[in-house]
Amino acid sequence: MDQTTLTGKSVIDSFEGEYEFLSNFYNCPVTYKGITYNNSEAAFQAQKVTDVYTQVRDFTGVTASVAKKLGRHCSLRPDWNDIRVDEMRAIVLQKFLQNPRLEKRLLDTGTATLIEGNWWNDKFWGVCKGEGCNMLGLILMEVRDYISKLRGAYLTSPEKLEPIDYLYD
């Protein structure tokens, strides 16, 4: 499948406009660990605390912006830095598996490189002024490859796909 025939782009460098659905701030329900959130950002921010009551009380029914603000002011679980990437990966996977229209749109990005370009200086999850780890972009590409393999529509040759252990648990 030629990526150019899908999006016409080899790099998607921001999650705005027609690619806003790639953002964690995109409004779509995500159920994670039995709790339904309005968006994947709220689901992610809720994982910063271990108390389910707090997760439900503070993070369900809120916008992504409110969830992010709440996440900045909560007491972080002690293992947060160790688990945050795995939590993000699992939440992003659920976002697309639970929303077939978004799953199709993700697959329609073909083999485009996905970059969480931003101006707010997030150099861990994204890229700002050409610098950053782009963890969200990498996770989205990983999830895209996994779903394409799951659905039998390989974007890369099957032998090039590495097993993603967390997805098979």
Which residue stretches match the model-derived regions?
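Charged, low-complexity intrinsically disordered segments
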Residues: 1-169
